[in-house]
């Protein structure tokens, strides 16, 4: 609590003090280090000054009535390190004139100031009502009602208002200033949707008098508007079964968290997705239209009905070209109109490898057939660019192309492999494409090189549309082959080597006649042997029995149990004695005379036959 004390002075001391003060008195309202004003017609008196050099020794403030009590001087103790003090209302009289000065260690600090309590006062803060009317027409406008501070009704105050975004630091003051006799509402125009704002005000008595303090800010938020720029990312018109499309839209206020409701439809079928975060939603298969609206919207009117119907290819733009713009960080895109004029064109682009939601796009009127894509593009990085014609009944997109802000030298070469020879003995090779992020430009041509031991390297350029090569007229031996790719910036490094080996086929052809002759002789010998087998089989069989032991020519030879050492005895079947036959009638016939045959000459035996011929007894022919 401030310490107030009334100082009693003698008439002579008071006169000297008043004279010294009057000589150094500054008129009221003039700027100076000491500022004093009252707050409201019945408020306190507030004095402030610039910070002093000696903060440890507190100053002392004095004020003296100039109108009602000229002989009374009040002393106010100021706490240390404080550059302001408040004088309660009971220490001065309303509509009085005060003389105020200060000292520190008995020395005067500033020239004394004269304060007229009738005029030199700050009004209290105006009252701002929480009801805010927002108009959603061409632009967002907010209207705020307010009431003036407590003040004599016969006097008019001048009030000023300001507003700002909740997260901003700089205020925007509204013009013109308002007076309390009309109470015109406060209007704020060109507000952003879905944004938090604050508004406050202050008042003053007249121009030249001090302004009152700013009122506590009133916070309000503008409604979320339906997104106007809705587009589709991906292959919405893909028919090969790899359809992957994503509905995307631009966030009107990136710093404000809001969820959306998305509608998809096809004929009489409607699909709703609620609580969808900003700013993407997968597109179900076979949908024909899409609508996006903020989740907190009380009424739904289709704001942007994006058609997803795919039109005929001839309606799409054609001859899409991409080039780098000289002296600009963007990429220039050109195209030609299809068979009919669209409502607008949409050019979208994305960096190679980015997901579907990382898509940028721009809309162009139907008369534009070229554009310079905005943004910062990196050199050597491929960007997929698509130009789409938008019609009332659907979309027609041109095939995507790849563009570069600046083409660089490739970082790698293509891999090469061997195909079946065509014709036999003539190698055929093929190579693949270099990945786009390593190609770093548009391929102008390929170069394949062949190197053999002892010979110089031979290289040949082929078109960038060619990925196979036939290698005729190669001499016999081993080779190494590799392929490089070039852009407008230069030739890249070689790819992996492919080893080739061509054997000498002439040796094989020289040996073929001898090989065929050998086979002919072999076949001839086999034929003759088969023909003579039947003739020699009987004789060979006889001599085999006579000359070879039995255990050799037996079907299953068994030398241990063989009887080859025993005399050869052939078992023959003996004739059976005749049996009595049936009694038959006998007819006598006349016998013919028997003619004796000439005697055969007796066999001549040399004695050698006994070694291997069986005797008649052995044969069982004699009894």
Swiss-Prot record:
Record's keyword annotation contains Signal: yes
Extracellular-side positions: 25-510
Gene3D superfamilies: Immunoglobulins
Induction conditions: Down-regulated on differentiation of CD4+ T-cells in both Th1 and TH2 cells.
Motif (Box 1 motif): 552-560
Cytoplasmic side of membrane: 532-623
Location of the motif WSXWS motif: 211-215
Boundaries of every Fibronectin type-III domain copy: 30-124, 125-225, 316-412, 413-505
The organism's place on the tree of life at top rank: Eukaryota
GO cellular component, one term: extracellular region
Signal peptide: 1-24
Tissue: Expressed in CD4+ and CD8+ T-cells, B-cells, natural killer cells and macrophages. Highest levels in CD4+ T-cells and natural killer cells. Expression highest in Th0 cells.
Family (UniProt): Belongs to the type I cytokine receptor family. Type 2 subfamily.
Name of the protein in its database record: Interleukin-27 receptor subunit alpha
Organism: Mus musculus
Organism classification: Eukaryota, Metazoa, Chordata, Craniata, Vertebrata
């Amino acid at each position: 609590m401030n310490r107030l004390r009334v100082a009693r002075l003698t008439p002579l001391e008071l006169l000297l003090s008043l004279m010294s003060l009057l000589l150094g008195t500054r008129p009221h309202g003039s700027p100076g280090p000491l500022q004093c004003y009252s707050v409201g017609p019945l408020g306190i008196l507030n004095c402030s000054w610039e910070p002093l050099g000696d903060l440890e020794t507190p100053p002392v403030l004095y004020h003296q009535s100039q109108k009602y009590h000229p002989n009374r001087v009040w002393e106010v103790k100021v706490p240390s390190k404080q550059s302001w003090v408040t004088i309660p209302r009971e220490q001065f009289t309303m509509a009085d004139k005060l003389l105020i000065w200060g000292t520190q260690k008995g020395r005067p600090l500033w020239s004394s100031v004269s304060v007229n309590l009738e005029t030199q006062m700050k009004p209290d803060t105006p009252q701002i009502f929480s009801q805010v009317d927002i108009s959603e027409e061409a632009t967002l406008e907010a209207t705020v009602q307010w009431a003036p501070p407590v003040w004599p009704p016969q006097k008019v105050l001048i009030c000023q208002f300001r507003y700002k975004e909740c997260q901003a630091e700089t205020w925007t003051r509204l013009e013109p200033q308002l007076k309390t006799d009309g109470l015109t509402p406060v209007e704020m125009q060109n507000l952003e949707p879905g944004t938090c704002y604050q508004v406050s005000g202050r008042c003053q008595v007249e121009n030249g008098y001090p302004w009152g303090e700013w009122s506590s800010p009133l916070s309000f938020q503008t409604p979320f508007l339906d997104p106007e720029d809705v587009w589709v990312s991906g292959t919405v018109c893909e028919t090969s079964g790899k359809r992957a499309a994503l509905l995307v839209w631009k966030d009107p206020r990136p710093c404000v968290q809001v969820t959306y409701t998305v509608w998809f439809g096809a004929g009489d079928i409607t699909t709703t997705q609620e609580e969808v975060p900003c700013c993407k939603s997968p597109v179900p298969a076979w949908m024909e239209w899409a609508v996006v609206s903020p989740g907190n919207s009380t009424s739904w009117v289709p704001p942007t009905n994006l058609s997803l119907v795919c039109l005929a290819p001839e309606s799409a733009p054609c001859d899409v070209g991409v080039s780098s713009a000289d002296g600009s960080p963007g990429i220039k895109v050109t195209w030609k109109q299809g068979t009919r004029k669209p409502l607008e064109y949409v050019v979208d682009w994305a960096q190679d490898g980015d997901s579907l939601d990382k898509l940028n796009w721009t809309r162009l009127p139907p008369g534009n057939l070229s554009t310079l894509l905005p943004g910062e593009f990196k050199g050597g990085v491929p960007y997929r660019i698509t130009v789409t014609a938008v019609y009332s009944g659907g979309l027609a997109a041109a095939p995507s192309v790849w563009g570069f802000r600046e083409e660089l030298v490739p970082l790698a070469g293509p891999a090469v492999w061997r195909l079946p020879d065509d014709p036999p003995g003539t190698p055929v090779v093929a190579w693949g494409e270099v990945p786009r992020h390593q190609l770093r430009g548009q391929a102008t041509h390929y170069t394949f090189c062949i190197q053999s031991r002892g010979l110089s390297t031979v290289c040949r350029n082929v078109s960038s549309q060619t990925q196979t090569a036939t290698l005729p007229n190669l001499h016999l031996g081993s080779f190494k082959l590799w392929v490089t790719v070039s852009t407008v910036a230069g030739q890249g490094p070689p790819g992996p080597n492919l080893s080739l080996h061509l054997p000498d086929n002439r040796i094989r052809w020289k040996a073929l006649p001898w090989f065929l002759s050998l086979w002919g002789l072999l076949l001839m010998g086999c034929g003759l042997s088969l023909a003579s087998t039947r003739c020699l089989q009987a004789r060979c069989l006889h001599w085999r029995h006579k000359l070879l032991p039995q255990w050799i020519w037996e079907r299953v030879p068994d030398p241990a149990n063989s009887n080859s050492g025993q005399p050869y005895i052939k078992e023959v079947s003996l004739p059976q004695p005749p049996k009595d036959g049936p009694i038959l009638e006998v007819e006598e016939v006349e016998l013919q005379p028997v003619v004796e045959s000439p005697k055969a000459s007796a066999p001549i035996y040399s004695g050698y036959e006994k070694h291997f011929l069986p005797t008649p007894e052995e044969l069982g022919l004699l009894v």
